[in-house]
Amino acid sequence: MNAIVALCHFCELHGPRTLFCTEALHSPHPQGASCGDSIGQGEQAEDEEMGIQMSSRIRCHSPAEGASADSNSPRPKKSDMCEGCRSLAAGHPGYISHDKETSIKYVSHQHPNHPQLFSIVRQACVRSLSCEVCPGREGPIFFGDEQHGFVFSHTFFIKDSLARGFQRWYSIIVIMMDRIYLINSWPFLLAKIRGVIDELQGKALKVFEAEQFGCPQRPLRINTAFTPFLHQRNGNAARSLTSLTSDDNLWACLHTSFAWLLKACGCRLTEKLLEGAPTEDTLVQMEKQADLEEECAAREVADGEEGRPRLQPELMEGRELSKCPTESSVLSDCSWNMVQRRMGVFRSLRHMRQVLGASAFRMLAWHVLMGNQVIWKGQDQELIQSAFDVLQAMLPVGCVRVIPYSEKYEDAYRCNFLGLSPQAEIPLHVQSSEFSVMVDVRHANRSNLYPALFVDDEPLSKYEFVVASGSPVTIDKVGLTILNKIEAALSNENLSMDVVDQCLICLKEEWMNKVKVLFKFTKVDSRPKEDTQKLLGILGASEEDNIKLLKFWMTGLSKTYKSHLMSSVRSPTASECRN
């Protein structure tokens, strides 16, 4: 956790002062750390421990040799400090603890060595002991800003028989630049810092009661004659916190507590990547997988009733994939599909665009996005399968219906991706239809028909691709908004295909969100056409092609989403009518 914990004191002579602070150093690491009091015991304890275990390290917190005060340090001069303003003795280098789990070192000094950190801690100290206080001047408070950091401050009093009012004012502050993290840590910090304060107050109270029992100060002050001149009572009003608590190991214990506080607070809250709600593609894939499993289970039951031997799950899965190529082609996690993708000729949309040409690819992509039937006719099944794998990436999973290869023509309602053998006959009305596009894969007459292709694309040099449709797409037409963005990404050579793939996913999610809004607006709420046109204008899809695309993509919504929307949207309306 990137934070600083500091103990501050309001000195009667010098005002707010920082007594002791602990910070976590990630890099650079301080060097020369050694155990001051018991080197052998300290090294043995470090070998046995994993992480920071403060109970066994109180006696051997090592002074940080590399953390000594620099001549250019912004810390106050000795003339501006008294016993109450000073924690570590002159020349004391500070304390350091090493966390083996995270390789973080927790270093404690009286002041931070870095000038910017010193300024931040100094300002937080002044504010915590002057203007930023809670009612009663004792308790927790939160303040800060983006420039100087955010501060959790807990002010408290320590009993002192020689101080004005028999008490001195202190505060423990936690400074962090992450406001949300600090606010979420409020309950934890309050409980742990309150424990440290209670321990300090308990020790000081025992010393105070012992001093009052031996030499009561209240009667002495009452009997003292009043004088208008300022003077320091008893000549020793500025007492150190070590003297007030009668604890010679106070600063080592505070280093222990503050270092543990930084480590524990950093471990209790961790950042997690939230995937959010499942996408429509995920829901559709889950539904298709569930249907496939139900079909397999029903077939097993039927085979068991007829006395047939039950197939092993692996064999059953393989048989289902071979018998149901349409279903298996849309499951991205099928091993069969991944093998075909690796062996395919077309590697990506950009590769296909380079092979077919910009105008032919635009026509083909337009028909794919609009839901028209895409027919590939040729002898090479691997080539056709790879083309379908690449093209269907532009569509939601629910809109994809594939027949990879067939000896006869299949109607458009059965599939929008159809692979045919060269001997298959295509009806004339399909060839002239504006709702279909055909790619005829022929053997090329010359081996160098595509000289722009790479050397490793030898299979493509054997073919000539003829793209034809009854509704050609003109280049000067504005067309589909999503198609224009896809072509812009594909034509930008500065973008790798990994970036283009992520761009394509974002574009599909953007337009699927528009589909969801339109579905709720028209199918669930049954709004009139005038309101629907206004909505389409707001969505940026008022053009005819975009409207057709939204209607086609609406068929790709999952059954789960549709049923959930129909059940959850209408219930509030019914309750409002009852009220």
Curated annotation (Swiss-Prot):
Positions bearing the site annotation: Essential for GTPase activation (GAP) activity: 164
GO molecular function: GTPase activator activity; protein-containing complex binding
First-listed, main subcellular location of the protein, grouped into a coarse class: membrane
Region of interest (Disordered), residue spans: 32-52
Boundaries of every dDENN FLCN/SMCR8-type domain copy: 493-558
Domain cDENN FLCN/SMCR8-type: residue ranges: 337-491
Taxonomic superkingdom: Eukaryota
Cross-referenced InterPro entries: FLCN/SMCR8_DENN, FLCN_DENN_C_sf, Folliculin, Folliculin/SMCR8_longin, Folliculin_DENN
Regulation of its function: GTPase-activating activity is inhibited in the folliculin complex (LFC), which stabilizes the GDP-bound state of RagA/RRAGA (or RagB/RRAGB), because Arg-164 is located far from the RagC/RRAGC or RagD/RRAGD nucleotide pocket. Disassembly of the LFC complex upon amino acid restimulation liberates the GTPase-activating activity.
Subcellular location: Lysosome membrane; Cytoplasm, Cytosol; Cell projection, Cilium; Cytoplasm, Cytoskeleton, Microtubule organizing center, Centrosome
Entry GO CC: centrosome; cilium; cytoplasm; cytosol; FNIP-folliculin RagC/D GAP; lysosomal membrane; mitotic spindle; nucleus
Domain uDENN FLCN/SMCR8-type: 86-242
UniProtKB keywords: Cell projection, Cytoplasm, Cytoskeleton, GTPase activation, Lysosome, Membrane, Nucleus
An annotated GO BP: cellular response to amino acid starvation
Function of the molecule: Multi-functional protein, involved in both the cellular response to amino acid availability and in the regulation of glycolysis. GTPase-activating protein that plays a key role in the cellular response to amino acid availability through regulation of the non-canonical mTORC1 signaling cascade controlling the MiT/TFE factors tfeb and tfe3. Activates mTORC1 by acting as a GTPase-activating protein: specifically stimulates GTP hydrolysis by RagC/RRAGC or RagD/RRAGD, promoting the conversion to the GDP-bound state of RagC/RRAGC or RagD/RRAGD, and thereby activating the kinase activity of mTORC1.
Sequence similarity: Belongs to the folliculin family.
Subunit composition and interactions: Component of the lysosomal folliculin complex (LFC).
Protein's UniProt name: Folliculin
Organism of derivation: Xenopus tropicalis (Western clawed frog)
Underlying gene: flcn
